From Swiss-Prot:
UniProt protein name: UPF0235 protein MM_0822
SMART domains: DUF167
Family from the record: Belongs to the UPF0235 family.
HAMAP family cross-referenced by the UniProt entry: UPF0235
Organism: Methanosarcina mazei (strain ATCC BAA-159 / DSM 3647 / Goe1 / Go1 / JCM 11833 / OCM 88)
SUPFAM superfamilies: YggU-like (SSF69786)
């Protein structure tokens, strides 16, 4: 069994968590999360929308909101809005919740 190193991409805050993500826009299929990059310490995400006019960011936020069962208004891009490497603030989600949810989807 692989170690749960994806936990390194999640940081706990008082108000929620910060998640480091690497996005591949314009993919054939939507996959949130799609894997973990252990060198960059980022959870990987594949989006079907292209990175034009914020469409991929919109899909990322909507997909994460659905994954965690929260409102998309509780998710903010704290850095990397125009980059494939992003950090997102997710309010109202604990570190333990995030590990459980991502872990369930990342176990191979």
């Amino acid at each position: 069994m692989r170690s749960m190193s994806f936990e390194e991409a999640i940081k706990s805050l008082d108000s929620g968590i910060i998640v480091d993500i690497e996005v591949t826009p314009g993919s054939r299929s939507l996959s949130v999360p799609s894997g973990y990059n252990e060198w960059r310490k980022r959870i990987e995400v594949k989006l079907t929308r292209n990175a034009q006019k914020g469409k991929a960011n919109e899909q990322l936020i909507e997909s994460l909101a659905e994954l965690f069962g929260i409102c998309s208004s509780d998710i903010f891009i704290s850095s990397g809005a125009t980059s494939s490497k992003k950090s997102l603030l997710i309010k109202g989600v604990s570190y333990q919740q995030a590990v459980l949810v991502f872990g369930k989807h990342l176990k191979g």
